[in-house]
């Protein structure tokens, strides 16, 4: 907006009143942002109204020297600067924001408010019959109380119900009454008093619930309850109030149709029937991969296509087409990755193919998308839960030693398990050993021993999990056994690169790390010489047997992002 004044420099600075009654922001003026509407200055701190596009320095605004405030009627409040008073806590009595210049203060009562709480005083009374049958009255004073709605402590300005003896935070009066959360299949409703009962722990944070305080409870599940603040967390609730919205049972289409006792038609492979494999069918198929989870068929019950090489574990064939997930607030839909495409799981950060659970913006592979609470792992004695507070951005995974965002945590001990480690196959096969390898970890009192990987012959950190053979005593790094591409299907092309099983007589050189690939699979891309040599300047050692092309190999995801290889292995949308 245009400057309100344009006075000469030798005249006293004029001041203006704020031309609106909207909430103000206290921001830094910069040349790229705007200028003061009074003095035309483009630097310093100013008050800004986003609705009116008005901004002005505090010293350019005409503020009253004293004010009367309805929440402090005993004494007038005087305009002062925060730096002139050293006995306050530096925060506004009502909104608890940091006080800035100017503030209004009563020295007799040590009562301070900011400009917004002077111009927009809090409501003295609040009556919301849907929330409570009585009127709540503001107590504008510093007083320690326990909120009857959320169970959290407050230190000032509670709203009080004289008839019931309730004290609430102002924000807790407006808590939604009926909601859905991603930790429970049914709706939960707010109550100010749970009442006696075996409520156990909160369904989100897993801490104890006080039956005498407010919470959310499920009408269908008599002992299920969630703390009020836990239920409305951004990572738990999608923000939709469901009061007065009819609850209708969602009809989710079955993933397959039954043809007979042995055959089905699955939605992802409707062109052919899938037949249930018997015990005699396992031989010869144990190395085949399930097209849903991209793990070996092994000895698990499975379906196989009667006409083509398509396999599904029986468990994967029964995956629901729509479900809730503890890591997302919306329901996820089961989809099939199209040929030539690949995904990156938002929780375990792995590149994957096969089935995926998707929302509008995020993708989960079926392993992470199928995790539910409580989660039990054979290498940990206690159940695990997805617990994350706002202050805990990253947690240390006890399996791989990395700090991760999406983890499953133990409420008994301080153990955390990342999603990638939680979904590791319990048993695998490797060329280094004739037996099945199983997941292992070294007990705390034995972690001083030195272990070596039988694949790469490097040291193996005993503080992290590894694969080992109980018969031979062999030990291997998890990455040496699985590699980075264990969630992709060998033989398929991703972009212009093909995933190839590393079962040749010799190990090939990687384009990036310049080492021979020791992992179970690698990416291979062929580039025409005319393009590679002239435009990209590929080194001569990359030439294949054919004089007309280069062949590139990448042994890991880090190597796949090499400046040469990235041309052929397209990056994933994060």
Where do the model's predicted regions map?
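Cys/His-rich zinc-coordinating "finger" modules and their low-complexity flanking regions
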Residues: 1-574
């Amino acid at each position: 907006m245009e400057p309100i004044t344009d006075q000469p420099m030798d005249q006293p600075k004029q001041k203006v009143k704020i031309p609106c009654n909207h909430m103000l922001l206290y921001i830094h003026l910069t040349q790229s942002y705007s200028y003061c509407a009074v003095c035309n200055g483009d630097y310093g701190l100013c008050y800004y109204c986003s609705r009116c596009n008005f901004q002005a320095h505090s010293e350019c605004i005409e503020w009253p020297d004293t004010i009367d405030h309805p929440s402090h009627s005993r004494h007038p409040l005087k305009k002062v600067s925060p730096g002139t008073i050293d006995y306050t806590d530096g925060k506004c009595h009502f909104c608890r924001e940091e006080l800035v210049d100017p503030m209004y203060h009563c020295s007799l009562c040590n009562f301070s408010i900011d400009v917004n709480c002077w111009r927009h005083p809090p409501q003295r009374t609040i009556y919301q019959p849907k929330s409570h049958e009585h009127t709540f009255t503001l107590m504008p004073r510093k007083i320690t109380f326990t909120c009857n709605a959320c169970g959290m402590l407050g230190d000032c300005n509670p709203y009080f119900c004289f008839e019931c003896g309730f004290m609430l935070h102002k924000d807790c009066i407006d808590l939604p009454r009926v909601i859905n959360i991603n930790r429970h299949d049914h709706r939960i409703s707010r109550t100010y008093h749970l009442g006696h009962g075996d409520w156990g722990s909160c369904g989100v944070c897993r801490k104890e619930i006080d039956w005498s305080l407010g919470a959310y409870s499920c009408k269908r599940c008599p002992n299920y309850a969630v703390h009020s603040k836990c239920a409305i967390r951004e990572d738990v609730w999608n923000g939709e109030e469901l009061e007065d919205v009819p609850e209708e049972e969602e009809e989710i289409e079955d993933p397959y149709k039954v043809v007979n006792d042995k055959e089905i038609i699955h939605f992802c492979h409707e062109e052919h029937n899938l037949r249930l494999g018997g015990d005699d069918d396992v031989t010869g198929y144990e190395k085949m991969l399930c097209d849903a989870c991209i793990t070996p068929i092994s000895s698990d019950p499975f379906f196989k296509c009667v006409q083509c090489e398509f396999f599904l574990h029986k468990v994967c064939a029964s995956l629901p087409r729509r479900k809730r997930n503890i890591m997302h607030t919306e329901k996820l839909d089961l989809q099939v990755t199209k040929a030539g495409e690949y995904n990156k799981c938002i929780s375990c950060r792995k590149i994957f193919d096969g089935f995926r659970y998707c929302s509008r913006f995020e993708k989960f592979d079926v392993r992470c998308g199928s995790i539910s609470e409580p989660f039990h792992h054979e290498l940990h004695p206690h159940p695990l839960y997805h617990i994350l507070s706002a202050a805990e951005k990253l947690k240390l995974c006890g399996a791989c030693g990395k700090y991760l965002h999406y983890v499953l945590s133990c409420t008994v001990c301080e153990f955390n398990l990342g999603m990638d480690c939680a979904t590791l196959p319990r048993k695998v096969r490797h060329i280094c050993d004739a037996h099945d390898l199983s997941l292992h970890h070294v007990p705390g009192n034995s972690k001083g021993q030195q272990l070596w990987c039988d694949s790469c012959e490097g040291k193996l950190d005993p503080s992290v999990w590894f694969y080992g053979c109980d018969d031979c005593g062999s030990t291997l790094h998890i990455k040496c056994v699985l590699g980075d591409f264990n969630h992709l299907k060998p033989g398929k092309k991703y972009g212009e690169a093909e995933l190839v099983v590393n079962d040749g007589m010799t190990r090939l050189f990687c384009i990036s790390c310049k080492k021979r690939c020791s992992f179970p699979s690698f990416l291979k891309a062929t580039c025409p010489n005319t393009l590679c040599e002239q435009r990209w300047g590929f080194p001569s050692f990359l030439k294949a047997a054919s004089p007309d092309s280069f062949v590139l190999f990448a042994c890991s995801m880090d190597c796949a992002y090499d400046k040469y290889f990235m041309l052929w292995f397209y990056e994933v949308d994060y």
